[in-house]
Amino acid sequence: MTALISQPDLLPPPAPERCPPQQTARLFRETPLLLDCGQVVQDVRVAYHTYGTPSDHAILVLHALTGTSAVHEWWPDFLGEGKPLDPTRDYIVCANVLGGCAGSTGPAELPRVNGEDPPLTLRDMARVGRALLEELGVRRVSVIGASMGGMLAYAWLLECPDLVDRAVIIGAPARHSPWAIGLNTAARNAIRAAPGGEGLKVARQIAMLSYRSPESFALTQSGWGTRRPGTPDITTYLEHQGEKLSTRFCERSYLALTGAMDRFQPTDAELRSIRVPVLVVGISSDVLYPPAEVRTYAGLLPRGQYLELQSPHGHDAFLIDPQGLPEAAAAFLHGA
């Protein structure tokens, strides 16, 4: 099924007083976690947020590369009363991934492999997430994720098929193309060439070019000297984005998470084994994960459906220009 989404969602973000605090769980204290690389990890810390009344069925939100478990901070179009993630109706869980830097166990706390941080996988992250759900008493989930979170949703479908009822995958392929791996390689090389923060700034600038589109930048960054005399607006915009990320993100996490995405290469046969309903959403102007690529993977899923978000703003449209996507996601998540 293909749909063109064009109506904006004008509902306000959730009120601050309804935003819960971050919580922390300590997992794998008795039985250690075996990583795909062969390393054993004991006492894994997982930072997470929950919304709504605890239940044995939850909606599991999977965050993007530099995201956090605080869904209310980055996805107000999706979280709130009357929205796809409705705390008055649903029990919603979002956890910071293993290897990230927003409260969960990070690369510096993991056993090293040949003197380097261990090569984490998305399946490792799914196994940690499963342990958290068991800790919370959750037996079944509907999954929603975008970008890296969408790729992680594929990992959940393959690693935990007994837990997942259905999934919404937004702006994500099942496996990275040479193009996507190349962009990540350039970003990682920038970090390694200039450790200590400067490389991370450049990595973010590279990424931002793939998160938007030529049309988006023409609409929003075509000025000259607006922010700094004699400097193109696109230049100051990219520099600002790099500075912002460098104050809140860890370069080792950036290396670990982009590497995990690149290593996730499920076969077509594995994708055809997924038996639950999956809504796959492409974005019309996405240059990072072109819609034709995303649609191809949807076609491999026996119960896959495909929708396309029409937006000029590229990959990040799921955050900044979701239009009618929240309504479509809500209908799918709740079986309409």
Swiss-Prot record:
Q: Which Gene3D superfamilies match?
A: alpha/beta hydrolase
Under the cellular component aspect of Gene Ontology, which terms does the record hold? cytoplasm
Which residues does the record give as substrate binding sites? R204, D316
> EC top class, in one word?
transferase
- In short, the EC number is 2.3.1.31
The catalytic residues are S147, D286, H315
Range of residues in the leader sequence: none
* Domain AB hydrolase-1 per the UniProt entry, residue ranges: 58-321
Q: According to the lineage, what is the superkingdom?
A: Bacteria
Family, according to the entry, reads as follows: Belongs to the AB hydrolase superfamily. MetX family.
Its quaternary organisation is: Homodimer.
What is its biological role? Transfers an acetyl group from acetyl-CoA to L-homoserine, forming acetyl-L-homoserine.
Quote the protein name from its UniProt record: Homoserine O-acetyltransferase
Gene source species: Deinococcus geothermalis (strain DSM 11300 / CIP 105573 / AG-3a)
